């Protein structure tokens, strides 16, 4: 099958984590389960090493890294109240 007809691109995800101090961490990854496990084990971002995760609030899928990164940047500019409202619409079940 020609390469252009096969879908070899993995989706990217933006995820929001509520931390123990009730702040919200936003990140991107291709594997949410693996990345969340890294945050839980203290091997994730410095932010979540200092403020350990309480729960995964939301996960949003994107077709490519550029769109996910752009969305991550936008979300990081929001207030905690805006992030919580967004997370409520994209909650992890």
What are these regions (language model features)?
Residues 1-44, 50-53, 58-59, 66-81, ...:
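GIY-YIG nuclease catalytic motif and its immediate N-terminal context
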